[in-house]
């Protein structure tokens, strides 16, 4: 980029950074990218992991650095914030749509409702991303990553993950 770079231009660049574990989504889609501000000539980029200790965060930081440096932007710092903790409520509707297209069931309830269900032992229904059936069951609370659970659809006989 030439000339003065503003916050909106940096946000546009960062909106293209893909999540390394789910490359169909950007870090903005997932709500990992929390904020970009300009303070004293330095862009402060705030990110929040989907889970504390998420192994993808270092790759995400490196990808952010690469995107900005390729555009000639070196006046930035990346700040990882774990409080407040990430919530699926931060995901964009576009991100949820992309998850489903990718074959992962998007979160179907708010984080608050999900926590209430965990406390009370009440299970929430998860819609199959392949056939849209609600005739599904949890097979494991953890999928390929800590932020996903493994389910099985009794209608189309497909295993699938749910983003939790």
Question: What are these model-predicted stretches?
Answer:
Residues 1-164:
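Domain-level signature for proteins that mediate thiol-based redox and metal-cofactor handling
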């Amino acid at each position: 980029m030439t000339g003065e770079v503003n916050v909106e231009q940096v946000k546009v660049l960062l909106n293209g950074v893909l999540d390394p574990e789910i490359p169909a989504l950007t870090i903005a889609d997932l709500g990992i990218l929390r904020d970009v501000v300009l303070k004293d000539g330095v862009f402060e980029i705030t990110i929040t992991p989907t889970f504390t200790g998420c192994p993808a965060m270092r790759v995400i930081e490196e990808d952010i650095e690469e995107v900005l440096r390729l555009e000639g932007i070196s006046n930035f710092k990346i700040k990882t914030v774990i409080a407040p903790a990430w919530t699926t409520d931060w995901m964009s509707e576009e991100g949820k749509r992309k998850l489903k297209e990718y074959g992962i069931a998007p979160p179907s309830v708010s984080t608050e409702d999900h926590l209430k269900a965990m406390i009370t032992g009440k299970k929430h229904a998860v819609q199959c991303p392949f056939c849209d059936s609600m005739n599904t069951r949890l097979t494991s609370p953890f999928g390929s990553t800590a932020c996903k659970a493994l389910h099985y659809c009794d209608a189309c006989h497909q295993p699938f993950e749910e983003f939790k």
